Each structure stands twice: as structure tokens, then as C-alpha cells.
């Protein structure tokens, strides 16, 4: 995939996507603002403690990759940064508001269930229910220019599967859950059909005995 980010780059992009929506008056962002956002104690998993020099190195790399651009001059006393990651006139990646909310939350907090994503992304986009979050995840998974998310194998004792973004790595660690589920469903259908035939035969035999 052309959109590949390391851990720090994913945190920076996630923070900029988030702040563009939640605090638009503070966007574009300065180095200090981005560093503070990256090291937030809330809404971040894992919590990081990046220095300004580490963040600056990451910003420089993202500028070279054309995922960010700098804004200076014209009254700006400090260099500001804005992302070109998605929905930019300079890039090809176009995401809906719902997709942006999910991608941002996955970048900032790692693998999560649809229910967790719906709750945690509420500041960015209000999903009507978990089903809308699930359908948006499916869209991200099935996009022609993607996939951008993958569903992971359900953990033991968990009701929901988690999803993770694919902007840092591929889907090789995802279990073929859908395939397994399809096999189980097929086996169950065959078993039901067999039982129905057995019941019908027993009814026929009973009717013959009572005749």
C-alpha cells in the first residue's frame, strides 16, 4: 500500500486528523502543539513520551513523503503544519466523515471493536448505532484503493472481533475468520438438513405403524 506509516508517523497523522476536527481554531498546528497532542494521556494507546526533536524528525519525514506541508510567513511567527494525508487537493485518498473518524481513532488507539470505535470516535463523528460503525468498517475493508482496515480473529471470551488499520503493515496477521465462519455455517446447514430428513423418515414410519 502507498500509505505506509511507522509508529510515530501514525501518531502524528492521527493527532492532526483529530485536532483538525475537534480544535479547528488551533489548526494548522505548530511543533509544540503536535508534540503535546502526541503525548496526551487520554485517548491514546499506547501513551507516548516523544521529545520535540523526535517529533520534528517525524514531521520532516512526513513532509518528504508529501503527507504534510509546512506553512510559514504571512504573519506566522512559527512554522505550522497541515496534513495532506486525506481529503486534500494534493492527494488521492478521499474519506467520508465517518471513515475519517474511524481511521483517526484506529491510528490513535490501535485495534478496537466496532462498539469501542463508535464510542471513542463520538467527538469526531456521531454514529447512529454500532451497525453504522460496522458498515463503515466494511467499506474501508472493501475499497478498491484499499483495504484500509482488517478484521482480526475474535479473542477467546470476546463477543466482538477487533479491527485494526492497515496504514502500518499488511493484513498477514489477520486470521481468516470469515472463511472459518463460512465453513462452520455450511456444516451447520448440512447437519440441519440431515436432521430434517431423519425426522421426516421417523414421521413416515410412525404414520405407517398407526395406519
UniProtKB/Swiss-Prot annotation:
Region annotation (Disordered) ranges: 168-188
Coiled coil (residue ranges): none
Source taxonomy: Bacteria, Pseudomonadati, Pseudomonadota, Gammaproteobacteria, Enterobacterales
NCBIfam families with a match to the protein in the record: PRK11239.1
Family named by the database record: Belongs to the UPF0502 family.
Name by which UniProt lists this protein: UPF0502 protein PC1_1804
Amino acid at each position: 500500500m502507498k500509505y505506509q506509516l511507522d509508529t510515530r508517523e501514525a501518531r502524528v497523522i492521527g493527532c492532526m486528523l483529530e485536532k483538525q476536527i475537534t480544535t479547528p481554531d488551533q489548526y494548522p498546528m505548530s511543533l509544540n502543539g503536535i508534540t503535546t497532542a502526541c503525548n496526551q494521556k487520554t485517548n491514546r494507546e499506547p501513551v507516548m513520551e516523544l521529545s520535540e526533536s523526535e517529533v520534528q524528525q517525524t514531521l520532516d519525514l512526513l513532509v518528504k513523503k508529501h503527507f504534510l506541508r509546512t506553512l510559514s510567513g504571512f504573519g506566522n511567527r512559527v512554522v505550522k503544519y497541515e496534513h495532506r494525508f486525506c481529503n486534500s487537493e494534493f492527494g488521492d485518498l478521499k474519506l467520508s466523515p465517518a471513515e475519517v473518524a474511524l481511521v483517526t481513532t484506529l491510528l490513535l488507539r490501535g485495534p478496537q471493536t466496532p462498539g469501542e470505535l463508535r464510542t471513542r470516535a463520538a467527538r469526531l463523528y456521531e454514529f447512529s448505532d454500532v451497525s453504522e460503525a460496522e458498515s463503515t468498517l466494511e467499506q474501508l475493508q472493501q475499497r478498491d484503493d484499499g483495504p484500509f482496515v482488517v478484521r482480526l480473529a475474535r479473542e477467546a471470551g470476546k463477543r466482538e472481533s477487533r479491527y485494526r488499520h492497515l496504514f502500518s503493515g499488511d493484513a498477514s496477521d489477520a486470521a481468516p475468520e470469515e472463511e472459518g465462519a463460512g465453513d462452520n455455517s455450511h456444516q451447520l446447514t448440512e447437519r440441519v438438513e440431515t436432521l430434517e430428513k431423519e425426522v421426516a423418515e421417523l414421521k413416515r414410519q410412525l404414520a405407517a405403524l398407526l395406519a
